[in-house]
């Protein structure tokens, strides 16, 4: 499901952010200039409508950067396979 939420995460101690490009009950694709290495375990905070924030955790399974020429067609970013998500996350899919 295509949904755009602000995503905050940390890489090597640095605060980073991106936006969801695609979300599903089992994972998230995040568009971001900062790309974690596949295999990295990541905690991310999603900013939902009405000021709600939820924290999800998972392992990065894919990470890639496209050339500037393709960036309007194909997003650079990474995929997280979720392993720990609150009930509020799953409610996003029941509402749609």
Q: For the regions a protein language model found, what residue spans apply to each?
A:
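Structured alpha-helical
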Residues: 1-96
């Amino acid at each position: 499901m295509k949904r755009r939420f602000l995503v905050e995460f940390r890489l090597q101690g640095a605060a980073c952010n991106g936006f969801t490009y695609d979300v599903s009950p089992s994972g998230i694709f995040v568009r971001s200039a900062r790309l974690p290495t596949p295999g990295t375990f990541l905690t991310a905070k999603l900013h939902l409508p009405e000021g709600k924030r939820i924290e999800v955790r998972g392992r990065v399974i894919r990470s890639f950067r496209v050339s500037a020429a393709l960036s309007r067609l194909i997003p650079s970013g990474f995929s997280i396979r979720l392993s720990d998500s609150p009930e509020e996350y799953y409610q996003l899919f029941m509402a749609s």
